[in-house]
C-alpha cells in the first residue's frame, strides 16, 4: 500500500500461493469480492489496473477513497474504497477475478490515439501509456487530463517521465482550481475544465 496523493493509495497485489499471475491487456480491470466487516454479503467492485502488464510479479490498482456527497455530509463515504484505504493491511488475502474488460489498447494498431480523462479516471490510461512507452511503439498519442490542482494530480511524476521518454506522447494537463504553488507551464498547461 503506497500513498499517492490526497485520498488515493496504490495497492501492489501479489499471489499468495506463489503461482504466476494471469496476464492482462493495458486498460483492463480486476474484479474484487470484498468481505467487509459489518456487511452481510460480499461487496463486488471493479478497479482498473494502473501499471504496465510488463510487470508479471504484481498487479497495481490505485483507489481513491470516495467521500460522502458534498450536499449530504452525514452519509457514509464509499464502502469499498474506505475498506481499501483505511482497513486493508499488508498480507491480507483478497478474492480477485482474473483481469477482464473491453477497454484495452490494441498494441498492434498504428492508428493515433486520443485519451480524455480526469482525476482517478487516469488509471487505465496510465496502464496503456506505460505499455506503449515501454514497447517502443511509435504511435501518436494525445492525452487530455483534467485535475483540480497539484494536490490531486495523481501519478504526476510517472506521467512526466512517460512524456519525456515518449516523443509521440502529447500530454495536456488542465487544472480547474490551481493552488498558489501550482505553476502554469510547469505543472499544467491549461486552466479550466477539459471539454
Predicted regions and their residues:
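Reductase modules of NAD(P)H-dependent flavoproteins
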Residues: 144-195
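Conserved S-adenosyl-L-methionine
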Residues: 110, 131-141
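Short, glycine-rich nucleotide/cofactor-binding loops
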Residues: 112-123
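Histidine-anchored nucleotide/phosphate-binding helix
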Residues: 49, 122-134
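A structural signal for isolated positions on well-ordered beta-strands in alpha/beta enzyme cores
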Residues: 60, 95, 114, 140-144, ...
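A short, basic/flexible loop-to-alpha-helix module at the beginning of a structural domain
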Residues: 97-111
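Ferredoxin-reductase
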Residues: 1-92, 147-149, 174-178
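Short, well-ordered coil/turn elements that cap or connect secondary structure elements
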Residues: 56, 138, 164-166
Amino acid at each position: 500500500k503506497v500513498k499517492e496523493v490526497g485520498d488515493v493509495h496504490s495497492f501492489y497485489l501479489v499471489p499468495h500461493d506463489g503461482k504466476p499471475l494471469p496476464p492482462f491487456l493495458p486498460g483492463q480491470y480486476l474484479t474484487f469480492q470484498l468481505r467487509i466487516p459489518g456487511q452481510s454479503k460480499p461487496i463486488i467492485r471493479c478497479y482498473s489496473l494502473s501499471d504496465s502488464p510488463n510487470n508479471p510479479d504484481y498487479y497495481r490498482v490505485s483507489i481513491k477513497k470516495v467521500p460522502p456527497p458534498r450536499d449530504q455530509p452525514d452519509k457514509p463515504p464509499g464502502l469499498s474504497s474506505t475498506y481499501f484505504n483505511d482497513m486493508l493491511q499488508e498480507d491480507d488475502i483478497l478474492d480477485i477475478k482474473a483481469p477482464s474488460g473491453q477497454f484495452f489498447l490494441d498494441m498492434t494498431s498504428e492508428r493515433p490515439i486520443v485519451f480524455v480523462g480526469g482525476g482517478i479516471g487516469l488509471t487505465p490510461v496510465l496502464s496503456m501509456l506505460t505499455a506503449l512507452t515501454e514497447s517502443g511503439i511509435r504511435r501518436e498519442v494525445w492525452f487530455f487530463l483534467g485535475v483540480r490542482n497539484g494536490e490531486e494530480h495523481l501519478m504526476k511524476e510517472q506521467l512526466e517521465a512517460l512524456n519525456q521518454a515518449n516523443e509521440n506522447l502529447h500530454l495536456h494537463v488542465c487544472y480547474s482550481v490551481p493552488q498558489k504553488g501550482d505553476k502554469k507551464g510547469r505543472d499544467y498547461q491549461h486552466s479550466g475544465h477539459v471539454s
